[in-house]
């Protein structure tokens, strides 16, 4: 296998990554908190403690709004500090059987044994390694559309990733 991908690390990619990360954060954390809060609010309503039930639901709503606001502020701060906004960088990935090679200013090899997870966003793969590095592989960076499918199938086989395209 020798699949090549050229991903442009720029403002657009940063925004898409943050949107994906924020959505997954909200799904994981907010759903659990909402279910627990709704359970307590229902109990309070059954006990006819309407003001406490309303207060709990109000706190839940404020938490949701603050979480969204913090994510927007964090993204805005990051965009101000990121050199990729003014100087986009092309990162080339070459996926092989036992490793992938990452090339930008310098080149490095990443063994698949160090990969902890592979996730699929709507328009990129996100590869996370044990040394806490994240590699974003943009779907637009494949020369051949079949390469994206082949790479997804490879990830499914190698990591039991269950990626659907």
Write out the residue ranges for each language-model feature.
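Generic beta-strand structural signal
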Residues: 94-95, 119-120, 129
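Hydrophobic alpha-helical transmembrane segments
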Residues: 39-62
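Phosphoinositide-dependent membrane-docking surfaces
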Residues: 100-101, 108-125
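A membrane-cytosol interface segment of integral membrane proteins
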Residues: 126-165
């Amino acid at each position: 296998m020798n699949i090549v991908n050229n991903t442009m690390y720029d403002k657009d990619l940063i925004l898409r990554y943050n949107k994906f990360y924020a959505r997954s954060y909200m799904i994981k954390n907010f759903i659990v908190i909402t279910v627990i809060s709704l359970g307590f609010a229902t109990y309070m309503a059954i006990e006819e403690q309407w003001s406490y039930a309303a207060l709990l639901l109000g706190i839940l709503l404020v938490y949701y709004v603050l979480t969204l606001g913090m994510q927007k502020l964090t993204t805005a701060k990051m965009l101000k500090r990121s050199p990729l906004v003014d100087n986009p960088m092309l990162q080339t990935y070459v996926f092989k059987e036992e490793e992938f090679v990452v090339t930008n200013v310098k080149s490095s090899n990443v063994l698949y044994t160090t990969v902890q997870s592979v996730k699929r966003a709507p328009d990129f793969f996100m590869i996370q390694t044990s040394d806490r590095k994240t590699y974003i592989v943009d779907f637009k960076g494949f020369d051949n559309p079949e390469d994206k499918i082949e790479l997804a199938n490879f990830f499914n086989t190698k990591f039991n990733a269950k990626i659907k395209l």
